[in-house]
């Protein structure tokens, strides 16, 4: 792996198949080193995909949605593979419009479905998108989505915005395994 320059931040490139790359986008307080994104990247690596992680956190005072879209744009501009899949957590879903415009498949972990713009942008997906959220997450509002036929919605009962069950580490680990398994199936279905 090697560090790459993304302008205002760095990226970490894990090199495997140069023709296939997952772009891993952090949330506002959820870095690419946190469990969901770490294991999403690991799943992709076992399938031979390269991965480009955005190594950044929201600077104090910045517009969070503008920050998320900017970092996504910079990472996508840097990804040189023929096949690119976006994997993003929470605030990263602010870039769903950019992903739709670039006709890319995506995995959105706990997307902000309480935000009309995010919902509208997700509904414009031109390639398959996997959305995973927990029923105990206030921003998880899957009924807000229009059924485009390309959105695969997975709801995990009793899980919060971190896709954890507070006070139950074993159940949280089971959830992490379920998320990794579902991401693996999604990548397999893409071919």
Question: Which residues does each predicted region cover?
Answer:
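Gly/Ala-rich beta-loop-alpha elbow adjacent to hydrolase catalytic centers
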Residues: 84-97
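Short beta-strand/loop motif that positions the catalytic acidic residue
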Residues: 125-126, 131-133, 137, 156
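A conserved short beta-strand
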Residues: 102-116, 128
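Serine-hydrolase catalytic machinery in alpha/beta-hydrolase-like enzymes
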Residues: 2-82, 165
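Catalytic histidine-centered segment of alpha/beta-hydrolase-like enzymes
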Residues: 159-175
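Acidic catalytic loop of the alpha/beta-hydrolase fold
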Residues: 135-140, 161-162
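Conserved loop-alpha-helix segment in the C-terminal half of the alpha/beta-hydrolase fold
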Residues: 140-156
């Amino acid at each position: 792996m090697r560090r790459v320059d993304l302008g205002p931040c760095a990226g970490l490139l894990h090199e495997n198949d140069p023709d296939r790359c997952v772009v891993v986008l952090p949330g506002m307080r959820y870095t690419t080193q946190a469990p969901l994104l770490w294991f999403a990247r690991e799943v992709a690596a076992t399938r031979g995909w390269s991965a480009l992680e955005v190594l950044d956190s929201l600077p104090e005072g910045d517009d969070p949605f503008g920050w998320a879209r900017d970092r996504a744009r910079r990472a996508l501009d840097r990804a040189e593979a023929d096949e690119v899949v976006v994997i993003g957590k929470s605030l990263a879903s602010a870039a769903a419009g950019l992903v739709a415009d670039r006709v890319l498949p995506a995995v959105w972990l706990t997307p902000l479905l309480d935000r009309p713009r995010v919902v509208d942008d997700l509904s414009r997906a031109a390639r398959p998108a996997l959305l995973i959220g927990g029923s105990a997450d206030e921003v998880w509002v899957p009924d807000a989505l229009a059924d485009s036929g390309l959105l695969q919605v997975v709801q995990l009962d009793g899980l919060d915005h971190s896709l954890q069950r507070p006070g139950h580490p074993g159940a949280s680990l089971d959830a992490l395994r379920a998320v990794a398994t579902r991401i693996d199936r999604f990548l397999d279905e893409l071919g």
